[in-house]
């Protein structure tokens, strides 16, 4: 694993991590409550992007911590994972006025965005990832140089960018509808028509608008 990670490599880490995170969260929800809960961050596709960013970040530092004692690796992974989770929560709240997780009341919670138990979970996931997934990913990147995977990356990147842009627009209008703000142009009318409140609640069933929760 080299010190530099190319964009196609980072994208595939983000892409696969987002999908794996979607199913990991769903399965964990089934174990805890007996029912599935959608944790996708996009209107189309099973993409829990906080895990995508986390996967890319964990892979990026795996080489840097490989020579450290296990406990130092654990702490480094835990810190990086917590930073990703905190940043994701902060951006979601300030961009869309909503949260998808809130650890308020848990031990050593910081603004409800992270807590000790989830930070430790990131550390454990990092250790497991560095031992199992990172070597497999590195092997794939080394062998995939003979594949047209850069072209595949370009196509998937364009599709993901479109999905994220559409999702952001739909979320923005959903937020505005909470205040009965009418659409201002044809694009917003189309967003309201195709992504009404009922559909958005079905997609983002764990999302709560902060001021509406009070």
State each model region's role:
Residues 1-214:
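Aromatic-rich, lipid-facing transmembrane alpha helices and their immediate juxtamembrane interface loops
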């Amino acid at each position: 694993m080299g010190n530099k990670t190319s964009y196609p490599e980072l994208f595939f880490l983000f892409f696969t991590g987002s999908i794996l995170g979607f199913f990991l969260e769903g399965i964990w929800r089934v174990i805890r409550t007996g029912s599935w809960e959608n944790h996708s961050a996009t209107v189309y596709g099973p993409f829990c992007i906080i895990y995508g960013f986390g996967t890319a970040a964990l892979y990026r530092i795996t080489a840097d911590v490989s020579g450290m004692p296990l406990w130092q690796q654990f702490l480094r992974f835990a810190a990086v994972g917590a930073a990703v989770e905190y940043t994701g929560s902060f951006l979601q709240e300030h961009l869309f006025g909503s949260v998808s997780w809130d650890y308020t009341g848990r031990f050593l919670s910081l603004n409800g965005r992270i807590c000790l138990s989830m930070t430790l979970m990131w550390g454990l996931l990092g250790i497991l990832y560095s031992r199992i997934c990172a070597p497999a990913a590195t092997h794939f990147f080394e062998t995939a140089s003979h594949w047209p995977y850069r072209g595949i990356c370009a196509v998937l990147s364009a599709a993901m960018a479109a999905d994220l842009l559409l999702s952001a627009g739909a979320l923005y209008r959903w937020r505005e509808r909470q205040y009965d703000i009418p659409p201002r142009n044809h694009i917003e009318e189309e967003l309201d028509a195709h992504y009404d409140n009922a559909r958005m609640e079905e997609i983002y069933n764990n999302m709560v608008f902060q001021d509406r929760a009070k």
